[in-house]
Design a protein with these regions (language model features):
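Glycine-rich loops and low-complexity Gly/Arg-rich segments
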Residues: 190-194, 214-215, 234-237
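Conserved donor-nucleotide binding/catalytic region of nucleotide-linked donor-dependent transferases
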Residues: 220-240
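Nucleotide-sugar donor-binding catalytic core of glycosyltransferases
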Residues: 1-207, 211, 243-261
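Short glycine/proline-enriched coil/turn segments at helix->beta-strand junctions
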Residues: 42-44, 214, 226-229
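Two-component system phosphotransfer/interaction surface
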Residues: 215-226, 251-259
Length: 262
């Protein structure tokens, strides 16, 4: 059984930390708590599991390692391996993904974005253009972390009611929303600054997502996609999620990469 040396960070107990709980509940892994801000896999503690959004924060430095699996920013180095990424609340997403998701005809929102700008880095990637002009259901509040318009359950349900969903850079080039869109089969509209290539299994344009450079391109792009094309993309998104970001899929991927680079 794979052993994970995990750190305990109560204020950040979501995303990968919540996924670790799910791996443990399913008896995929054995865990042991360690001090610090990083997680390790394997008995020798040689495999770094870097789930943090950035690698350049002086208060959260990357320690020495033999092989590192990186979820968001992936440094350009042979010891740094593209991994997968995680929803903000994997348990809630797992629950809605396991339900009967709305079909094409039942999705009454054509395009959607729900988010927030909480820091200058997010502002640079999200406020550089007026994305609200290209999205039918657009909500983005500005300011420090705090209350949101929707509960986490409402947010995921609403996301699943849309045919297309805009992705914008987060605190890193990937965002939890990217994975949430794939999970509920809402076809991503990928904006500049988003990284969809630095995964173990990269996203493929016009298979998993459509790409735009400006808000003005969005309506023409999504209008050109037929119902049958959307269904194919919807299914490809969900299959990618199952292979790479679901509870079982993310564990099998992690196990595969550790075995490959031992």
């Amino acid at each position: 059984m794979l052993k994970i040396y995990r750190c305990d960070i109560p204020q950040h107990h979501d995303s990968f930390l919540e996924m670790l709980d799910m791996w443990e509940e399913r008896r995929y892994v054995e865990t042991e708590y360690v001090d610090g801000h990083v997680h390790w896999a394997n008995e020798e503690k040689t495999f770094l599991l870097w789930h943090w959004p950035r690698v350049d924060e002086p208060w959260r430095q990357v320690p020495p390692f033999r092989i590192g699996l990186f979820g968001n920013v992936v440094p350009n180095h042979p010891q740094c391996i593209p991994w997968t990424f995680f929803a903000r609340s994997p348990k809630r997403l797992d629950k809605i993904v396991s339900s009967n998701l709305p079909s094409y005809g039942e999705r009454n929102i054509n395009s959607i974005f729900m988010g927030k700008v909480e820091n200058q880095i997010q502002a640079a990637g999200r406020n550089n253009q007026d994305w609200s002009t290209g999205i039918d259901d657009f909500y983005m509040s500005q300011g420090s972390p705090g209350s949101y318009k929707y509960t986490k359950e409402q947010y995921l349900e609403r996301l699943s009611q849309a045919k297309f969903g805009l992705t914008l850079p987060g605190y890193g080039p990937k965002c939890n929303r990217d994975i949430e869109l794939m999970g509920v089969g809402t076809v991503p509209i990928v904006a500049p600054g988003c990284d969809v290539e630095r995964y173990d299994e990269p996203w493929v344009e016009n298979i998993h997502y459509i790409r735009v450079e400006r808000p003005e391109e969005i309506q023409d792009k999504i209008s050109s996609i037929t119902k049958s094309q959307w269904k194919e993309m919807h299914n490809e998104c969900r299959m990618w999620y199952n292979r790479n970001a679901s509870t079982e899929g993310s564990f099998k991927l992690t196990e595969k990469l550790i075995e490959k680079y031992k």
